[in-house]
């Protein structure tokens, strides 16, 4: 919900799983949030930006988290397409 100034005033904004688009519940203690740094291609140094991926506990329980993170990183251009 937003107020008249356009600021978010909700007390709780749920996260969503980046792989399955499910809402990550507050009691899902198996879920993770991972920041992957963006690196300058010429110097190999961190440029101050990162991509955030959230993986829910159900994906981790099935053992699909590594494949999901790799698929998301390929789609964002962090990992090369032929990796």
Curated annotation (Swiss-Prot):
N-acetylmethionine PTM positions: 1
N6-acetyllysine modification, residue list: 81
Gene3D superfamilies found in the cross-reference section: 3.30.1230.20
Main location: cytoplasm
Database matches in Pfam families: Ribosomal_S21e
Any one GO MF annotation of this record: ribosome binding
Keyword terms of this UniProt record: Acetylation, Cytoplasm, Endoplasmic reticulum, Ribonucleoprotein, Ribosomal protein
GO cellular component term of the entry, any: rough endoplasmic reticulum
Protein location: Cytoplasm, Cytosol; Cytoplasm; Rough endoplasmic reticulum
Record GO biological process: cytoplasmic translation
Superkingdom of origin organism: Eukaryota
Coiled coil: none
Family the UniProt entry places it in: Belongs to the eukaryotic ribosomal protein eS21 family.
Quaternary context: Component of the 40S small ribosomal subunit.
Role this protein plays: Component of the small ribosomal subunit. The ribosome is a large ribonucleoprotein complex responsible for the synthesis of proteins in the cell.
Protein's name in the database: Small ribosomal subunit protein eS21
Species: Mus musculus (Mouse)
Gene: Rps21
